[in-house]
Swiss-Prot record:
Microtubule inner protein component of sperm flagellar doublet microtubules. Microtubule inner protein (MIP) part of the dynein-decorated doublet microtubules (DMTs) in cilia axoneme, which is required for motile cilia beating. Located at the center of the tektin bundle where may function to recruit tektins or stabilize the bundle. The keyword ATP-binding does not apply. Pfam families: TKTI1. One of its GO terms (biological process) is flagellated sperm motility. This is Tektin bundle-interacting protein 1. Keywords: Cell projection, Cilium, Cytoplasm, Cytoskeleton, Flagellum. The gene is Tektip1. The keyword Cytoplasm applies. GO terms for cellular component: axonemal A tubule inner sheath; axonemal microtubule; sperm flagellum. It is found in: Cytoplasm, Cytoskeleton, Cilium axoneme; Cytoplasm, Cytoskeleton, Flagellum axoneme. Its main location: cytoplasm.
Length: 206
């Protein structure tokens, strides 16, 4: 708890308190801060890893974190039974941190905050099936169709240099023909980028 008080007095959250490197060491249950609309405090992930030989996949193991003391499947970020009882100490403390700020806001703003920040305390939950997760989202390493064109938009139609020193958006762009900007001939008619031919001449009808 000393770390929590020390981090709460700082004006900004240092990057060392955020969970940048996964997994953290096993015996740490300090509060951390997640970047979000309300900077909600959370607890380290409940899923730890068993001791496995190096080079093997670690099997997920559910550890008791004190968030729920009756039913392990009951998530701690759901509505508690009563805010004045220590049924869920972590959720009650998280809810009380921002209760004073919400009193000075109009009701529409407080409802908007609740709708936007419902995911703040959601960390790696106690799922029965195996699979890495980041927060409450399933981690997928496969590409999403359509997203790869955003990164390499300036290289459309050209061969990508699949070299070890190639970095997207940092290496020299491989632009297709007729797409390089020429400021000296900006006013002239440029050929069509798709077919590489000049546009048809405009003949006004008399």
């Amino acid at each position: 708890m000393e770390n929590v008080r020390r981090e709460a007095t700082r004006p900004s959250v240092p990057s060392g308190t955020l969970e940048l490197y996964f997994p953290d060491h096993l015996y740490r249950n300090d509060y951390v801060s997640l970047e979000g609309p309300r900077w909600a405090p959370a607890i380290k992930q409940a899923v730890r890893w068993k001791f496995t030989p190096m080079g093997r996949d670690a099997a997920g193991q559910v550890w008791f974190t004190g968030l729920t003391n009756s039913e392990p499947g009951d998530a701690w970020y759901k509505l508690p039974r009563a805010l004045d009882t220590p049924y869920r100490e972590a959720h009650t403390r998280w809810h009380g941190c921002f209760q004073s700020r919400q009193r000075g806001l109009p009701p529409a703003y407080t409802q908007h905050l609740r709708e936007m920040a419902f995911w703040d305390p959601a960390i790696t939950a106690q799922y029965l099936n195996s699979g890495p997760r980041w927060g409450c989202m399933q981690w997928r390493d496969r590409q999403i169709r359509g997203k790869e064109f955003v990164v390499t938009r300036n290289q459309f139609g050209a061969k990508l240099p699949w070299r070890s020193d190639y970095v997207p958006l940092l290496s020299l762009p491989q632009r297709p023909r007729f797409t390089a900007q020429d400021f000296r001939q900006r006013g002239l008619q440029r050929p069509c980028p798709a077919i590489g031919q000049p546009p048809p001449a405009f003949t006004p009808a008399l």
